[in-house]
């Protein structure tokens, strides 16, 4: 018989902890000067904790490719530092993915504003 869940599931707690630690590591641990201001937005972890997809955004959109290279180059270092901070049976393999949800939201907001400006307000 399955136990009822209390509060957060373990996987959610692990995701939150990985996200916090990676955000700190990216902020303080990346020595590459090409790495701009990177924000870790979300982390998705597989059920067996073998893989973690890290969704991030950057302040300077022009440096998107460079930031991707920097993160890929630092992936092993970030994983080993994460292993020191989080006690898991297996530290997940990190996969970095640019989070386009913010851009999509801004584009959608701009479209709504455009339609609202074109349509006269009726009383």
Swiss-Prot record:
Q: In terms of domain of life, where is this protein from?
A: Bacteria
Please provide an example of a Pfam family that matches this protein in its UniProt record.
RBFA
InterPro entries registered for this protein in UniProt: KH_dom-like_a/b, RbfA, RbfA_dom_sf, Ribosome-bd_factorA_CS
Would the keyword Cytoplasm be found if you checked this record's keyword annotation?
yes
Q: Which GO molecular function entries does the Swiss-Prot or TrEMBL record give?
A: ribosomal small subunit binding
Instruction: Check the record and name the PROSITE patterns matching this protein.
Output: RBFA (PS01319)
Q: Which residues form a coiled coil?
A: none
The reply to whether Ribonucleoprotein figures as a keyword in the UniProt entry is: no
Q: Where in the cell is it found?
A: Cytoplasm
Q: Which UniProt keywords apply?
A: Cytoplasm, Ribosome biogenesis
- A biological process (GO) annotation for this entry? ribosome biogenesis
Annotated Gene Ontology cellular components are: cytosol
State the family named in the UniProt similarity comment for this chain.
Belongs to the RbfA family.
- Its biological purpose: One of several proteins that assist in the late maturation steps of the functional core of the 30S ribosomal subunit. Associates with free 30S ribosomal subunits (but not with 30S subunits that are part of 70S ribosomes or polysomes). Required for efficient processing of 16S rRNA. May interact with the 5'-terminal helix region of 16S rRNA.
The protein's assembly and partners: Monomer. Binds 30S ribosomal subunits, but not 50S ribosomal subunits or 70S ribosomes.
Name of the featured protein: Ribosome-binding factor A
């Amino acid at each position: 018989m399955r136990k009822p869940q209390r509060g957060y599931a373990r996987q959610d707690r692990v995701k939150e902890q990985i996200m916090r630690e990676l955000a700190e590591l990216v902020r303080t641990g990346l020595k590459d000067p090409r790495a701009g201001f990177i924000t870790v937005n979300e982390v998705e972890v597989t059920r067996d904790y073998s893989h973690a997809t890290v969704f991030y955004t950057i302040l300077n959109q022009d440096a998107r490719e460079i930031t991707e290279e920097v993160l890929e180059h630092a992936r092993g270092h970030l994983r080993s530092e994460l292993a020191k901070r989080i006690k898991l049976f297996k530290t997940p393999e990190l996969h970095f993915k640019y989070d386009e949800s913010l851009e999509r939201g801004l584009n959608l907001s701009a479209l709504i504003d455009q339609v609202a400006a074109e349509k006269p307000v009726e009383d």
